[in-house]
Amino acid sequence: MAAKDVKFGDSARKKMLVGVNVLADAVKATLGPKGRNVVLAKSFGAPTITKDGVSVAKEIELKDAFENMGAQLVKEVASKANDAAGDGTTTATVLAQAIVNEGLKAVAAGMNPMDLKRGIDKATAAVVAELKNLSKPCADSKAIAQVGTISANSDDSIGNIIAEAMEKVGKEGVITVEEGSGLENELSVVEGMQFDRGYLSPYFVNKPDTMVAELEGPLLLLVDKKISNIRELLPVLEAVAKAGRPLLIVAEDVEGEALATLVVNNMRGIVKVAAVKAPGFGDRRKAMLQDIAVLTGGQVISEEIGLSLETATLEHLGNAKRVILSKENTTIIDGAGADTEIEARVKQIRAQIEETSSDYDREKLQERLAKLAGGVAVIKVGAGTEVEMKEKKARVEDALHATRAAVEEGVVPGGGVALVRALAAIVDLKGENEDQNVGIALLRRAVEAPLRQITANAGDEPSVVADKVKQGSGNFGYNAATGEYGDMIEMGILDPAKVTRSALQAAASIGGLMITTEAMIADAPSEAPAGGGMPDMGGMGGMGGMM
């Protein structure tokens, strides 16, 4: 096992503090409407320019192992805030830096670190409760657009497109962000349920100009196995032909003789039919087939529940107003499923979202939920260059998380004002002893840090602005973008309450851990032996020694 380097007490904390400050100083430059840019060198390709705090934090690794530990712990603050609310990472970093710097001063002055931590925790709980009281519900799309704009570093085109997307697909709908091909941002909304499987044969196409197959008022046959034998399908095909309606077959696969017969029947006009593979794989495929069944009021023909293709009747088939199949996608519009059953299915998926611990599973479940409950909106981000595209896409994703958080827990005045107003909750708060009181006072100073940093980045005097904001009340604050004072909500400067709360909780949690650190252990740097000369390369036919 490699030798370890161990540091204790003050010398350990000093090293850690250096790392904390290096990372936080780089990240906090991006805070606020006048946040500065940070340039990141890449091992290949052009450097990236960003105003996104997380991107900056991710790039930082320090040479000294102990300093690096401090930097990585602050990175943890940012990712904790990001996991909880999807935004607020820079605010969380600024708060953590303030708490750690003040806290370590107090520890160096002889305070008890455990009591300091208890004081910080007590004050944090009071501020979080006060933030809940300050928050106002975020109902209309104007407020949603304002939240999106602030989070996207004051880019109102991003705020507006997110508000429009939310209006179209509802609060439950899925909004995905993709790289577009033009210079402008575009929004496209998919109504109904869309899944990423296209027609199995181009001979099903009935609109050659757009290369799509459209079925009006079709019946849907949902099967969870491969269909290769046409004899299994005959009873259903005959019943559908008698009913005189088109048919969409969604199965694990349709191949060989079965597919050929369907194509021939379709081309001769005997039965208007199209076939498509079921979406997903394994258990997820079964679940998605069941979703389609619930949406269209049909049943999945599965041997697991004792149904086979030969015994299937029209009652087992789903109904929809229209189905559109392209080469890549299938869209089912206006399924005829019962509302009560769809609601029950939505409830079931929501319960699974709550239980799952995997981010991938959660994302897939949310997609399924949106397809049943709302719709899917796709924001295509437009930009002039690859570098700008990446940076803009990261900002759109941040803004999207922020607006979701705003809808969930409401909004508070932005620009660091909400934290200053929440100070009212800890003005008279007292701990059980003097050291806890120092912890409470320490947090009282730390919560001003975001407001001071936003002001400093805008080139103004932090102390003057902080004092003036503290003298005001309610939503009165400082608009760093214009240099004016006024009502933050009226000026459209809002933060989601959830983002502010998560940032403070993450910062207090990691800050408390750092203050109570007593020892640090890292791999000892390996002593590389001094490089000697090359050995004599004798023995190579007459080449004595190579000089």
UniProtKB/Swiss-Prot annotation:
The chain's coiled-coil residues are none
E.C. no: 5.6.1.7
Q: Where does ATP bind?
A: 30-33, 51, 87-91, 415, 479-481, 495
GO biological-process terms attached to the record: protein refolding
- One Pfam family per UniProt: Cpn60_TCP1
Q: Catalyses which reaction?
A: ATP + H2O + a folded polypeptide = ADP + phosphate + an unfolded polypeptide
Please name the GO terms that the record assigns under molecular function. Answer: ATP binding; ATP-dependent protein folding chaperone; isomerase activity; unfolded protein binding
Q: Which InterPro entries does the record match to this protein?
A: Chaperonin_Cpn60_CS, Cpn60/GroEL, Cpn60/GroEL/TCP-1, GroEL-like_apical_dom_sf, GROEL-like_equatorial_sf, TCP-1-like_intermed_sf
Do you know which SUPFAM superfamilies this protein is assigned to?
Answer: GroEL apical domain-like, GroEL equatorial domain-like, GroEL-intermediate domain like
Per the record, the major location class is: cytoplasm
Q: Which residues cross the membrane?
A: none
Gene Ontology cellular component terms for the protein in this record: cytoplasm
Which Cys-Cys disulfides exist here?
none
Keyword set for this entry? ATP-binding, Chaperone, Cytoplasm, Isomerase, Nucleotide-binding
UniProt subcellular location: Cytoplasm
Class of the enzyme per the UniProt entry, highest EC level: isomerase
What does the UniProt record say this protein does? Together with its co-chaperonin GroES, plays an essential role in assisting protein folding. The GroEL-GroES system forms a nano-cage that allows encapsulation of the non-native substrate proteins and provides a physical environment optimized to promote and accelerate protein folding.
Fill in the subunit field for this protein: Forms a cylinder of 14 subunits composed of two heptameric rings stacked back-to-back. Interacts with the co-chaperonin GroES.
Membership in a protein family: Belongs to the chaperonin (HSP60) family.
Return the protein name: Chaperonin GroEL
**The gene coding this protein:** groEL
